[in-house]
A protein has these predicted regions:
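Class I SAM-dependent transferase core
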Residues: 3-45
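Conserved class I S-adenosyl-L-methionine
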Residues: 48-55
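Conserved SAM-binding loop of SAM-dependent methyltransferases across substrates and taxa
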Residues: 58-71
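Conserved SAM-binding motif I beta-strand of class I
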Residues: 73-78
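Short alpha-helix immediately C-terminal to the canonical SAM-binding loop
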Residues: 84-85
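S-adenosyl-L-methionine
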Residues: 88-114
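A short acidic, Gly/Pro-enriched loop at the edge of an enzyme's catalytic core
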Residues: 113-121
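Mobile active-site "lid"/loop adjacent to the S-adenosyl-L-methionine
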Residues: 126-155
Length: 155
């Protein structure tokens, strides 16, 4: 495998126990144990073929689910351009995972563009804090990942 270009604010990680390599930001917007636990928590049924990952970030959850279920088609939806571009780079890095796709869009726009029955499984590792609560990180990407600045879980 050719080593990808890594920016100064990034690192290349290998996810233990998998064949997944992932470029991540080193400024605190990297995935956490919560994402690994969520991926392990998901139960698959034989009829599950299409999945959506809402707020897919770097793509880690989509790759973990695909690693666990080779037949699953997964589309990650990510609003933040920086993370969408990172997920696309990670997709090139993990080209062995056919059937993983990413779209740069607001998850609140999905109902207007995609039929709800298009997906058998929908997953998300949403922001932890409601807007206006807690201390807001200075970096915009980190703030949006941790706080409901672009919509609520209910939306």
């Amino acid at each position: 495998m050719k080593t990808p270009a890594i920016e100064l604010d990034e690192r290349l990680d290998t996810i233990p126990g998998t064949t997944i390599s992932l470029i991540q930001k080193i400024d605190g917007t990297a995935f956490s144990i919560d994402t690994l636990l969520l991926a392990d928590f998901v139960s698959f049924t034989p009829e599950m073929m299409n999945s959506a990952d809402l707020g897919s970030g770097s793509g880690i959850l989509a790759f973990l689910l695909k690693y666990r279920n080779k037949n699953l088609q997964i589309t990650g939806f990510e609003l933040q351009n920086e993370f969408f571009e990172l997920s696309e780079r990670n997709l090139k890095l993990n080209s062995q995972y056919e059937g993983v796709y990413f779209e740069n869009m607001d998850v609140r726009d999905i109902p207007a563009r995609i039929l709800p029955e298009s997906y058998d499984l929908v997953v998300s590792n949403p922001p932890y804090f409601p807007a206006g609560s807690g201390r807001l990180p200075e970096k915009t990407t980190r703030a949006q990942a941790r706080h409901e600045l672009n919509g609520t879980v209910k939306e």
